[in-house]
């Protein structure tokens, strides 16, 4: 047998099978599919913030581009810090905020994410004016 150090480890295989069982029993993918339009609606509600340049999304994933001041990455990092201080964590790449809520979330969690994103992005915007 030839494989990799991470191939065929019984504990890992058992864990993966258990996760698949949970996804099937709790209908995780269909729950996420049903929540996706609600998440997208919340995400696109942020387009009224002046520093938001572009919003795009698909399913339970979204990207928010922050307008730059000519220095790539600076606006994205600063916005990320304001959002983190507001209580939401995500990936920021360059000037794009990448949002992907967990599949197990509920509407109340999406509301919280969007509220904290709004707070963080708005705080960044206010800081830019000072």
Regions found by a protein language model. Name each.
Residues 1-130:
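Conserved N-terminal phosphate-binding loop of PLP-dependent enzymes in the Aspartate aminotransferase
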């Amino acid at each position: 047998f030839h494989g990799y150090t991470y191939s065929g480890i019984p504990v890992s295989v058992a864990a993966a099978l258990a996760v698949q069982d949970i996804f099937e029993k709790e209908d995780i993918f269909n729950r996420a599919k049903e929540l996706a339009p609600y998440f997208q609606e919340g995400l696109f509600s942020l387009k009224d913030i002046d520093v938001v340049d572009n919003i795009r999304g698909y399913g339970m994933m979204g990207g928010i581009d922050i307008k730059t001041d000519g220095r790539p990455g600076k606006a994205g990092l600063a916005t990320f810090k304001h959002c983190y201080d507001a209580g939401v964590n995500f990936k920021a790449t360059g000037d794009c905020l990448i949002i992907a809520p967990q599949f197990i979330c509920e509407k109340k969690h999406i509301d919280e994410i969007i509220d904290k994103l709004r707070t963080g992005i708005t705080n960044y915007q206010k800081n830019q004016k000072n």
